[in-house]
């Protein structure tokens, strides 16, 4: 008799647990459908337009740069001399923050551009000409862009070398190294000649 009672109690517990699991799944699916319906209503009611300028401004503000849309010169209002000095100090502070941000952001690009200028033989431009920024009467700092260094056109580059990439210099060295394919190397054939390779080094 005790065995039958234990079996009945275990069966009742399993039924209760199964019903609770089914109820939780039903409630979860119901909440998911409600959220999906709310999202559909929001998507139908709102109009989403992609604005590159707004994306650019939000990205700069996220990184700590004070940037806004410059709608033109402010209306002519008589200002006293202390107000003009305060606006000039705020302008210089914002401009210095923007310049610091640009310098920190473009430090790896500057190293890459210096290396490219050294390889291509282009004279390096002074930093003062790049970072020069005219002052205006706008209270918002103007964005500063780094110009890409001049690169040679692809039509002036030398032709493709045998089994190699195109050489970026005008005077390409003469290479006399034989090409070894993977099947040749798999067979263990040493196709490299030590003498021409040593001459290149």
UniProtKB/Swiss-Prot annotation:
Record field: transmembrane: 3-23
Domain of life assignment: Eukaryota
Compartments where located: Membrane
Membrane topology reported for the UniProt record: Single-pass membrane protein
Pfam families: THEG4
Keywords, alphabetical: Membrane, Transmembrane, Transmembrane helix
Any one of the GO CC terms: membrane
Chief location: membrane
PANTHER family: TESTIS-EXPRESSED PROTEIN 38
Descriptive protein name: Testis-expressed protein 38
Organism: Mus musculus
């Amino acid at each position: 008799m005790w065995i039958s009672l234990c079996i009945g109690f275990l069966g009742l517990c399993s039924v209760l647990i199964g019903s609770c699991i089914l109820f939780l799944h039903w409630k979860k699916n119901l909440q998911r459908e409600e959220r999906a319906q709310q999202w559909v209503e929001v998507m139908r009611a709102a109009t989403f337009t992609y604005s590159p300028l707004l994306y650019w401004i939000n990205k700069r503000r996220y990184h700590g740069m004070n940037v806004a849309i410059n709608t033109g010169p402010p209306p002519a209002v008589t200002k006293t001399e202390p107000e003009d000095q305060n606006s000039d100090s705020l302008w210089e502070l914002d401009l210095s923050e923007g310049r610091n941000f640009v310098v920190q952001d473009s430090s790896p690009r500057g190293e890459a551009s210096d290396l490219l200028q050294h390889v291509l033989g282009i004279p390096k431009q002074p930093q003062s000409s790049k970072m020069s920024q005219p002052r205006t009467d706008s209270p918002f700092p103007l964005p500063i862009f780094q110009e890409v260094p001049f690169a040679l056109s692809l039509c002036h580059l030398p032709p493709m070398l045998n089994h190699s990439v195109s050489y970026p210099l005008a005077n390409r060295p003469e290479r006399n190294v034989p090409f070894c394919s993977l099947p040749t190397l798999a067979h263990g054939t040493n196709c490299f000649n030590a003498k021409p390779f040593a001459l290149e080094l």
